[in-house]
């Protein structure tokens, strides 16, 4: 789960980190009210969970509440990398002396946490690594022993602070807070870019990012609730599929994919690519799927406006071919007919029963996954 900037900053604040005053607005009128409350100049930040908001016009500075109001009218409804701007974070403009980069990730190869720190900030870490790799310091933290003072000293010194100063203590507190957020919230990323020294000499995160492991959301009901209320980077189809219990990922093609098992589903996508097609999604119904599960999976793709063809690829072990066929039949019946083509390849348990059911409703069944994929791509081009 990717947290919005304002949500990430709320976590930072919860752990004692000072952040610039700011509130979330849902309308231009709210922007005007907030700008008057905190005082101009203000920064308007589109709350979409993608990188590069600034370059896409999603971050604007307003020198008066009235200017903030006018800017917000153009910003609400903007499309930034496929996501529509529905919220603006209105925050106090801060004059900056210098910018730094600080993040905490999980290094799966070493099975440790990894701090990435640079005295140069305000740009992607990939860009820093490309232009100034010598300016990035890596500090590993073993989760078995946790964050120690020598880790903090190493990071804060690299960022350019002198030990014993107020700025040193502020930066050290931010490092410690980021580590606590990482552990307490089962995060995959905690980042401040830029981490800034203001003209007043304070060390504060001007931007904040937090990504929480989806598999740990059950431990954080407040985040689960926030995700339900605001799916953020999740499409309506991904949200519905998750509610039903599918593993579903939205892609940008027009060939709908349904498989059982992640490996088979990914192999099915590869076949579609191989024959020149473009998958519209990844949808894994899992093992032992009932007709009800299959029906709901097919209905998701029948209602998807971009899907032209649905390619169902099933290997029946504990998944029965007749249950799959009945699920397809019921989905078509409940959808009231469709002009979308369905191509099926099924092998395994009760294959002949499934074949007979599909023959009744005129859905072609292929013995070879390659033949089925080729046919699906051909139909998508019609």
Curated annotation (Swiss-Prot):
Gene: sucC
Binding site for substrate: 260, 317-319
Subunit details: Heterotetramer of two alpha and two beta subunits.
Protein family (similarity comment): Belongs to the succinate/malate CoA ligase beta subunit family.
Annotated metabolic or biological route of this protein: Carbohydrate metabolism; tricarboxylic acid cycle; succinate from succinyl-CoA (ligase route): step 1/1
Source organism per UniProt: Pyrobaculum aerophilum (strain ATCC 51768 / DSM 7523 / JCM 9630 / CIP 104966 / NBRC 100827 / IM2)
Reaction(s) this enzyme catalyzes, per UniProt: succinate + ATP + CoA = succinyl-CoA + ADP + phosphate; GTP + succinate + CoA = succinyl-CoA + GDP + phosphate
Name of protein: Succinate--CoA ligase [ADP-forming] subunit beta
Entry EC number(s): 6.2.1.5
GO-annotated biological processes: succinyl-CoA metabolic process; tricarboxylic acid cycle
Cofactor dependency: Mg(2+)
Gene Ontology CC: one annotated term: succinate-CoA ligase complex
Details of cofactor binding: Binds 1 Mg(2+) ion per subunit.
Alphabetized UniProt keyword annotations: ATP-binding, Ligase, Magnesium, Metal-binding, Nucleotide-binding, Tricarboxylic acid cycle
Residue ranges of every copy of the ATP-grasp domain listed in the record: 9-240
């Amino acid at each position: 789960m990717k947290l919005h900037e304002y949500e990430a900053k709320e976590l930072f604040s919860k752990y004692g980190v000072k952040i610039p005053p700011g509130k979330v607005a849902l309308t231009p009128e709210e922007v005007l009210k907030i700008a008057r409350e905190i005082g101009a100049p203000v920064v308007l930040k589109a709350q979409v969970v993608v990188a590069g908001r600034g370059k896409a016009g999603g971050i604007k500075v307003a020198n008066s509440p009235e200017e903030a109001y006018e800017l917000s009218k153009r910003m609400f409804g903007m499309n930034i990398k496929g996501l529509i701007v529905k919220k603006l974070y209105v925050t106090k403009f801060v004059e900056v002396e210098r910018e730094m980069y600080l993040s905490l990730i999980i290094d799966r190869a070493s099975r440790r946490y990894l701090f990435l720190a640079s005295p140069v900030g305000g740009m992607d870490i990939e860009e820093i690594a490309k232009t100034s790799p010598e300016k990035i310091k890596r500090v590993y933290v073993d989760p078995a022993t946790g964050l120690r003072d020598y880790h903090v000293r190493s990071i804060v010194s690299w960022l350019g602070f002198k030990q014993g100063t107020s700025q040193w203590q502020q930066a050290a507190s931010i490092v410690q807070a980021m580590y606590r957020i990482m552990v307490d919230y089962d995060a995959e990323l905690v980042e401040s870019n830029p981490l800034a020294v203001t003209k007043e000499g304070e060390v504060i995160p001007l931007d904040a990012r937090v990504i929480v492991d989806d598999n740990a959301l059950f431990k954080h009901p407040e985040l689960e609730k926030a995700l339900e209320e605001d799916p953020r980077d999740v499409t309506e189809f991904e949200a519905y599929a998750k509610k039903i219990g599918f593993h579903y990922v939205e892609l940008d093609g027009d060939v709908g994919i349904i498989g059982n098992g992640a490996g088979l589903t990914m192999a099915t996508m590869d076949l579609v690519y191989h024959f020149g097609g473009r998958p519209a999604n990844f949808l894994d119904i899992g093992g032992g799927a009932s007709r009800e599960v299959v029906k709901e999976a097919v209905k998701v793709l029948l209602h998807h406006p971009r899907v032209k063809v649905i390619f169902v690829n099933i290997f029946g072990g504990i998944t029965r071919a007749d249950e799959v066929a009945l699920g397809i039949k019921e989905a078509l019946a409940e959808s009231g007919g469709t002009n979308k083509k369905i191509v099926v390849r099924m092998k395994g348990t009760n294959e002949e029963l499934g074949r007979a059911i599909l023959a009744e409703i005129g859905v072609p069944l292929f013995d070879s996954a390659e033949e089925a994929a080729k046919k699906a791509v051909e139909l998508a081009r019609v």
